[in-house]
Amino acid sequence: MASTPPQTSKKVRNNSGSGQTVKFARRTSSGRYVSLSRDNIELSGELSGDYSNYTVHIPPTPDNQPMATKAEEQYVSNSLFTGGFNSVTRAHLMDKVIDSDVTHPQMAGAKGSSCAMPACDGNVMKDERGKDVMPCECRFKICRDCFMDAQKETGLCPGCKEQYKIGDLDDDTPDYSSGALPLPAPGKDQRGNNNNMSMMKRNQNGEFDHNRWLFETQGTYGYGNAYWPQDEMYGDDMDEGMRGGMVETADKPWRPLSRRIPIPAAIISPYRLLIVIRFVVLCFFLTWRIRNPNEDAIWLWLMSIICELWFGFSWILDQIPKLCPINRSTDLEVLRDKFDMPSPSNPTGRSDLPGIDLFVSTADPEKEPPLVTANTILSILAVDYPVEKVSCYLSDDGGALLSFEAMAEAASFADLWVPFCRKHNIEPRNPDSYFSLKIDPTKNKSRIDFVKDRRKIKREYDEFKVRINGLPDSIRRRSDAFNAREEMKALKQMRESGGDPTEPVKVPKATWMADGTHWPGTWAASTREHSKGDHAGILQVMLKPPSSDPLIGNSDDKVIDFSDTDTRLPMFVYVSREKRPGYDHNKKAGAMNALVRASAILSNGPFILNLDCDHYIYNCKAVREGMCFMMDRGGEDICYIQFPQRFEGIDPSDRYANNNTVFFDGNMRALDGVQGPVYVGTGTMFRRFALYGFDPPNPDKLLEKKESETEALTTSDFDPDLDVTQLPKRFGNSTLLAESIPIAEFQGRPLADHPAVKYGRPPGALRVPRDPLDATTVAESVSVISCWYEDKTEWGDRVGWIYGSVTEDVVTGYRMHNRGWRSVYCITKRDSFRGSAPINLTDRLHQVLRWATGSVEIFFSRNNAILASKRLKFLQRLAYLNVGIYPFTSLFLILYCFLPAFSLFSGQFIVRTLSISFLVYLLMITICLIGLAVLEVKWSGIGLEEWWRNEQWWLISGTSSHLYAVVQGVLKVIAGIEISFTLTTKSGGDDNEDIYADLYIVKWSSLMIPPIVIAMVNIIAIVVAFIRTIYQAVPQWSKLIGGAFFSFWVLAHLYPFAKGLMGRRGKTPTIVFVWAGLIAITISLLWTAINPNTGPAAAAEGVGGGGFQFP
């Protein structure tokens, strides 16, 4: 279904007389699918090396469904879905995903009791609660293969000899009498005209109208897809239940979920005053400098005044947005009371929190170790949030089998790790970080079995790491064995057909999965349709959606007793979007947009949290912290919550300012008081509706049209320019994706539990269980990750992550702010997320180069803040303008760093003499700088050493990476030269003797040339001036000190760079000192020969003395 044209898809949906077709096929070694009849299928297992597929042609309908819903979901979760451009979407049923055994009932490949068919040793599938899946009402136990055979032959159940029917005996009809309905019931006119106003509205052509939710529906909403209760569930009972839920909420004293805490006036008032004072002093100083040129060295004066004017402008752009810093706090107890507490209308305490989809992206398992990614996934699966509301998606842009099987191993290990974390309240929930803690693990632990459980889980984790580390060799050995078998088969066939035995056998070197079938993604030996840039779309539900009710473990199932612990796991999906030559894949932004579409169809969480593969959840309550802002009064106009980035593995001195606390604790906190922090690429919780490119709601305007504040709104209410004909142009032709948009919008609203909440949803709206997955839904999600789906749509232009820049994160956040949304900065007491950062000098410079290049691209694009709309606040506009301009400071910074050396070489200075006026201005500017630094340290919480490290790195990166970024950006604009970057290598967390080994590795790069030249020239200039001074008959030391001071100031900023060049202490190559000394002596002798000392007369005239006088 997913590969058919969109219009065909709609027509098929309306054909209620057709059932789902299951098509068997054999995949040959060449990659073709050959249809098989029943007579050609041998039950001896000869197909073990080929694909056994069923092709989804027609979705099941309420009138003709081949098996029970939960049974179908189980079969779907055990299938690897593939598809894409000009290919049919296929579901490959897998006997096993990994070589090791699978025990958790939610995981693909989980087996139940034995099959009841004669001469069959297969196992029955398990549902999410560990019970056997039986497709027929007679409860006849049948395995997957026998069920497929029965379906293909007669369609009859082998037990009762009846046709497979709708029904799952384990399912109970949901009871909505408690009032837990998402929206008020439709009006009587709608219920009375079922023929004219059908739930499945059709357009004039008789096709399914995929815009019904966007423009005409006043239906109810559930978690995931839309849920319409039965007609008899509407009426007085429902109304009373709804009113009861509202009354219960209204009776409780209203408390806010978050608070805005202003900076104390004793700190912020002097800070603002100093900014004004320094601005005034700077203006007077620059005026004085312009009016008092140095006639003896006009070229030196002109260069210095141009640089100083730019520095003043740059300082204004950086400092003015810091006028309004704020702090925020959250109240998790209030969140729990509002959304998770039992009540008369919710006796089981089912959560009313909205769902959230967590995205993790990876691209190359060689540079991003699978163990690091697996630990990130485990921290997500163990997050403290309602299990049924969490869905995790991994985007593998490389399509590597190594990543696939590593994620399957992580899902298997989560069966033990996640319940262990819940049972003993473990923090952090990244196993590698937890077992690496240098503190007493028994601190604050009171359960008597903790030590025993920890010992067991540590052993299991060690075995898990060994399995992950052994995956490359395991895959290689497996593939070699299967390829050798295929070569022998091909050779045998060639001999039987009479071919020339001397000719080499041409069999592709395929990569094979654990169940003995070809991997549809990238092969180790890349071939056509199996390389990083050319492979089919792949989607595997590693962990199917959990049940709505807790699944309590027991002491017999696991190595650890979980008899009082919920053992459910969140849904986990592996996604590798389709890539084909000739299609622009748009790097990480394209991968994120593919996840947005796939997740909208599978889970449709109204909020999305994206993480890099090396950033894990350090605070298991981080999601709840973010929800306190989204669900609070006024939270409906928040587009995203940005969490600060914190890093591990940084050297104690933070030589290269990796922690970047000045930015994360200073600039971002200040922007939070304006319109919100910028999006920095990871650790961000998005509102899905904002990602779709819509404007924020205007409650006053919307309430003029709506009678009820909790009534469903149409998309045209948010975007008047969006009509029916523009919907496919903006979002594509996916019907399910279009239907999910207003559902996500509604579920993302705050509770309407306060009169001030003008735009909310009723309490209890999100307690409805989610719909199970079916083949049609998963096939549609494969369709939307195809390479052609975004053609002629607004994905990447207005919708989703924005394309066109290597820093797509900043542009995406800018677009949201430009539409009027605001963002919030969430700093928690315990770090929410932690990740790794490059501590090697060269890697750090390349990282900054990528960021700066993206800023230059922004400056030369339509995303320049100068062109922003009126919805972007003035201070926010200055902040975004600074984002695009700051790399250009490098042009003036490099020149200014050479000025002290030019002064010492020429004997002149930027001013004629060190007059009282110059010194007073210099002193006042310095005092203001120190005062601003001290006060900024006070309100931001950073340290003075961190502030100084940031200043040092600003000069180092400004004279290297930023300069190269400007050159690359200009070349791209003028000559159209595209910019490409290699993926930053992540640390694999190996147990090295020195965890800071990368810090001492010297990797040569052209980015090092400018700082080296600056340092050498200033050192030589000091040496030359020193030698010239001592050769004078009457040495003028004051002149030397005055000129050398500014050179030493430059060298002090370059000190971390010099340490990075020296590598490990005591291992500096001798040749470096030899050449440095020779160069210095040569230049000194050359300068002495060109400008020799002429004796006392020359000294009296000040020849070679530095060119300026102390007053």
Curated annotation (Swiss-Prot):
Keywords noted in UniProt: Cell wall biogenesis/degradation, Glycosyltransferase, Golgi apparatus, Membrane, Transferase, Transmembrane, Transmembrane helix
Transmembrane residue ranges: 266-286, 297-317, 891-911, 914-934, 963-983, 1007-1027, 1040-1060, 1070-1090
UniProt-listed Enzyme Commission number(s): 2.4.1.-
Pfam family, one: Cellulose_synt
Disulfide bonding pattern of the chain: none
Residue stretches of biased makeup (Polar residues): 192-202
Active site: D397, D809
Primary location class: Golgi
Keyword Transmembrane: yes
Keyword Glycosyltransferase: yes
Biological processes annotated in GO: cell wall organization; cellulose biosynthetic process; pollen germination
A GO MF term: cellulose synthase (UDP-forming) activity
UniProt region (Disordered), positions on chain: 1-26, 175-202
Membrane topology: Multi-pass membrane protein
Localization terms from the record: Golgi apparatus membrane
GO-annotated cellular components: Golgi apparatus; Golgi membrane
Assigned protein family: Belongs to the glycosyltransferase 2 family. Plant cellulose synthase-like D subfamily.
Role description: Thought to be a Golgi-localized beta-glycan synthase that polymerize the backbones of noncellulosic polysaccharides (hemicelluloses) of plant cell wall.
Protein name: Cellulose synthase-like protein D4
Organism per entry: Arabidopsis thaliana
